[in-house]
């Protein structure tokens, strides 16, 4: 970065402190504009609220939190499966001036206690399924108020609250702790201020669902504790209602009745669920015979063949984005017009899109020097959607935000048109015979075989090469009968030949193992760390 001019009148300029806009003000604006339009539908729990009713409920909860002792910047831990009152909780915590801390509800009691120790909650909102956790938290000395999902404070739309709510905040007051997946250690709390979260939501509106309004409907398919929560909050600008998927986990059988029944126009999901949406699309219907305008997917790579099938059945409604918790996913976007003409590099890897609005992507080498188009390095990001840092993790902050950029840990390159291609993660890389190997390239090649459902390649210690690659495969269909071992051997031989034909020799996995089900983390990500530990046992140390 260049030095500041010493002759400029702005050389010593310091911005004046100013009051921020509480993100919950967006809700009030929409409630004033379209008070009687639907905002939330949760038919499993018998809840349907208008925007005015949601605003009143947020006000009532904020008043209860402040009465219970929650001050500005105090943490409110929110632990619950999806429910209309989780949506009320998000808006109510924001309005109170507290900080939303929503860990994955699938975490164990011990894991939740670890997160609680990290963020020191002043209050807890939980569903009854987490009563044991609340008891355990109290045993550690927690004495703050507890609010139960299903029994949160209510208020009639337009009613004057009995307790006045002070929702004023500084623009740099934290308002959301967005937990990382913790796949390489305990989750970190990426901290978003009201200024950051406002920018994130406006970015989502601008890039992901720019034309949505109160006549549409957004289907909630994933836990609101992570990216789906951001997607839900972003619907406020258009006044689009959030419909919580009824009947439990989304399946091929339940998705289309929900999409058709509610007239869904947008949804945020992962490739696995998008594949179910495409697979379950009723036969005899064409791409124009549904209401979907934007199906937004992220969280994992999607095979080109799966993309092609979804495009063929659903038409040009797919939107892909890439990002991490520290940027709430807001790094790249692959728009509908890019799908079907998706740029592919020489290794057959597809792009994850161009930079999101207001975001700059920078590729750097090991020394932090910016690299030109076409050269591979670490993917770094700058922009208003990048979090303020990790709560209480100075070492992680120094590493991840070195040089003023957020270092994603992903490896890739930009082409001349600004498309980003990811080739791996720094943490996944292993060194075999002195050469760096990034598993992603190998995994994407293995996934082109129709008998492979999932593939993970990990580096394990080897006395000759330092490390070797081990491929762990979950088959699309497990073989049965007496010849199942032979079928596995045949597939392993075919996959080895596939790798030899498409990769440099040092990248070809030395071993291939099959598992019935691939292990995943509580956040649904493939458990690489667990697989690496399992297949490294008894092999000694690589270095």
Q: Can you name each region flagged by the protein language model?
A:
Residues 198-217, 225-265, 280:
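Conserved AMP-binding/adenylation subdomain of ANL enzymes
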Residues 107, 124-126, 267, 383, ...:
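AMP-binding/adenylate-forming catalytic core of the ANL superfamily
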Residues 264-268, 279-347, 360:
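Gly/Ser/Thr-rich phosphate-binding loop
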Residues 67-68, 95-156:
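Structural core segment of the AMP-binding/adenylate-forming
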Residues 65-70, 162-172, 177-219, 231, ...:
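Conserved adenylate-forming
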Residues 19, 43-47, 63-110, 221, ...:
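Conserved AMP-binding/adenylate-forming
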Residues 354-358, 366-399, 437:
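Conserved ATP/PPi-binding loop(s) of AMP-dependent carboxylate-activating enzymes
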Residues 3-4, 26-50:
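AMP-dependent adenylate-forming
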């Amino acid at each position: 970065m260049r030095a500041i001019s010493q002759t400029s009148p702005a050389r010593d300029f310091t911005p004046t402190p100013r009051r921020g806009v509480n993100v919950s003000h967006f809700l009030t604006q929409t409630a004033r504009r379209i008070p009687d339009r639907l905002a939330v539908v949760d038919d499993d729990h018998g809840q349907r609220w208008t925007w005015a009713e949601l605003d009143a409920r947020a006000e009532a909860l904020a008043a209860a939190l402040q009465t219970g002792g929650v001050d500005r910047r105090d943490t409110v831990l929110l632990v619950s499966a999806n429910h209309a009152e989780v949506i009320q909780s998000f808006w109510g915590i924001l309005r109170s001036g507290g900080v939303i801390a929503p860990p994955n509800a699938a975490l164990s009691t011990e894991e939740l206690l670890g997160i609680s120790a990290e963020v020191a909650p002043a209050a807890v909102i939980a569903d009854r399924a987490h009563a044991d956790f609340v008891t355990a938290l109290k045993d550690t000395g927690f004495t703050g108020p507890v609010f139960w999902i299903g029994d949160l404070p209510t208020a009639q739309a337009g009613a004057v609250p009995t307790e006045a709510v002070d929702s004023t905040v500084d623009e740099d007051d934290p308002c959301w702790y967005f937990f990382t997946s913790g796949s390489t250690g305990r989750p970190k709390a990426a901290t978003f201020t009201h200024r950051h979260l406002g920018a994130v939501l406006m970015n989502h509106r601008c890039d992901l669902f720019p034309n949505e309004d109160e006549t549409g409907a957004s289907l909630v398919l994933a836990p609101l504790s992570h990216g789906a929560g951001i997607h839900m909050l972003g619907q406020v600008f258009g006044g689009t209602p959030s419909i919580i998927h009824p009947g439990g986990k989304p399946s091929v059988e339940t998705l289309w009745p929900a999409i058709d029944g509610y007239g869904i126009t947008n949804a945020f999901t992962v490739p696995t669920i998008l594949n179910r949406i495409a697979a379950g699309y009723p036969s005899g219907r064409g791409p124009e015979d549904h209401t979907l305008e934007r199906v937004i997917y992220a969280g994992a790579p999607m095979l080109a063949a799966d993309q092609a099938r979804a495009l063929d059945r659903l038409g040009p409604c797919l939107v892909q984005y890439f990002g991490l918790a520290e940027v709430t996913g807001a790094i790249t976007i692959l728009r509908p017009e890019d799908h079907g003409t998706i740029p592919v590099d020489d290794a057959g890897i597809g792009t994850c899109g161009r930079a999101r609005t207001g975001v700059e992507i920078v590729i750097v080498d090991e020394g932090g020097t910016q690299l030109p188009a076409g050269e591979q390095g670490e993917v770094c990001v700058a922009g208003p959607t990048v979090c303020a840092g990790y709560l209480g993790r100075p070492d992680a902050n120094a590493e991840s935000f070195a040089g003023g950029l957020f270092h994603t840990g992903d490896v890739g390159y930009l082409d001349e048109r600004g498309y980003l291609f990811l080739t791996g993660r720094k943490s996944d890389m292993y060194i075999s015979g002195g050469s760096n190997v990034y598993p992603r390239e190998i995994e994407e090649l293995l996934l082109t075989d129709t008998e492979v459902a999932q593939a993970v390649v990990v580096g394990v210690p080897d006395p000759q090469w330092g490390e070797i690659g081990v491929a762990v495969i979950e088959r699309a269909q497990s073989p049965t009968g007496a010849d199942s071992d032979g079928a596995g051997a045949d597939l392993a031989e075919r996959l080895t030949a596939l790798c030899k034909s498409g990769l440099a020799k040092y990248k070809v996995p030395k071993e291939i193992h099959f598992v019935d089900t691939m292990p995943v983390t509580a956040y649904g990500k493939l458990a690489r760390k667990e697989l690496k530990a399992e297949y490294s046992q008894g092999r000694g140390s690589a270095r």
